[in-house]
Amino acid sequence: MTVAVRVIPCLDVDAGRVVKGVNFQNLRDAGDPVELAATYDAQGADELTFLDVTASTGDRGTMIDVVTRTAEQIFIPLTVGGGVRTVEDVDRLLRAGADKVSVNTAAIARPEVLREMSERFGSQCIVLSVDARTVPDGQPDTPSGWEVTTHGGKRGTGIDAVEWAERGAELGVGEILLNSMDADGTKTGFDLPMIRAVRAAVSIPVIASGGAGAVEHFAPAVQAGADAVLAASVFHFGDLTIGQVKDSLRDAHLVVR
C-alpha cells in the first residue's frame, strides 16, 4: 500500500498572529491563525503545523488559546512547536487540542527529553524539528556538510544534521521535520540533496520544509524522499492553493488524498 503524500501549510505564529519572513526576519502579518487554519482545512490540507516563533522567549498562554480555538474549527491533524522544552509542555499542548508536538532547541540541549516524551505520549505524537544549513566557510565541517542551527538559523551548533536526525529516530520520535535554513523563504525550491541524505539515514517519515516557491517545486522533494511537503508564504499570500499543489503531485504520478 502506497501512503499518500501529505501537503502541510505551516503557520508561524507571533503573539497570536500569523507572520512570515525570510529566515524568521522581516516578519509581515499574514492574518488570524484560526481563520487561516479553517481555510486550509477547507482547501484540502492534510495537516497543519503551528510554530510559535515568539515562544523561545515569550509567553505561552496566547499560543494555548490559539491551539484550543483552532482545534474546535478543524478536523485535520495539528502539529504545534516552538518553545517546547518539557514533558509538561507537550502535555499542555496535547490537552489544548494539538495532535503532535515538535521539539527543536530543547532536544539539542538534552537529547534524552525526546525519549521521555515519546515514551510518555507515543512516538506518533513527537516530531523532531531540524533547522539545518550548509556549514559556513571557515568553520569545522560536519560529516554530511550540514549542521543543525538554533535561534531561527542564526546560531550554528556544529552538530551534523543527518546524524542528528538519525539520533532522533533512535530516541523514539515519529517524524523528522527537516527545514533547510539555506532555502527558507527564498522560494527557489526545496534542498533536494539534504532530503536525500536524511531519507537514506532514517526509516521514519521526513517532512520537507524551506524553499517552496512554485508549484513545480513539490514533486521533486517527494521524489527525493520526503513523505510530506510543508510550506508557508506560498499559501498565506495566495501564490498557490493546496489543490494546485496536489494536482502537481498527481501529475507526477504521486499518490495524494
UniProtKB/Swiss-Prot annotation:
Cited CDD domains: HisF
Record has Amino-acid biosynthesis as a keyword: yes
Enzyme Commission no: 4.3.2.10
Lineage top rank: taxon: Bacteria
Recorded catalytic activity of this chain's protein: 5-[(5-phospho-1-deoxy-D-ribulos-1-ylimino)methylamino]-1-(5-phospho-beta-D-ribosyl)imidazole-4-carboxamide + L-glutamine = D-erythro-1-(imidazol-4-yl)glycerol 3-phosphate + 5-amino-1-(5-phospho-beta-D-ribosyl)imidazole-4-carboxamide + L-glutamate + H(+)
Subcellular location: Cytoplasm
Pathway recorded for this protein: Amino-acid biosynthesis; L-histidine biosynthesis; L-histidine from 5-phospho-alpha-D-ribose 1-diphosphate: step 5/9
GO cellular component, one term: cytoplasm
UniProt xrefs under InterPro entries: Aldolase_TIM (IPR013785), His_biosynth (IPR006062), HisF (IPR004651), IGPS_HisA/HisF (IPR050064), RibuloseP-bd_barrel (IPR011060)
Gene Ontology MF term list: imidazoleglycerol-phosphate synthase activity; lyase activity
GO biological process, one term: L-histidine biosynthetic process
Active site residues according to the UniProt entry: 12, 131
Family from the record: Belongs to the HisA/HisF family.
PANTHER family, alphabetized: IMIDAZOLE GLYCEROL PHOSPHATE SYNTHASE HISHF, IMIDAZOLE GLYCEROL PHOSPHATE SYNTHASE SUBUNIT HISF/H IGP SYNTHASE SUBUNIT HISF/H
Record's subunit section: Heterodimer of HisH and HisF.
Entry function: IGPS catalyzes the conversion of PRFAR and glutamine to IGP, AICAR and glutamate. The HisF subunit catalyzes the cyclization activity that produces IGP and AICAR from PRFAR using the ammonia provided by the HisH subunit.
Protein name: Imidazole glycerol phosphate synthase subunit HisF
Lineage per the UniProt record: Bacteria, Bacillati, Actinomycetota, Actinomycetes, Mycobacteriales
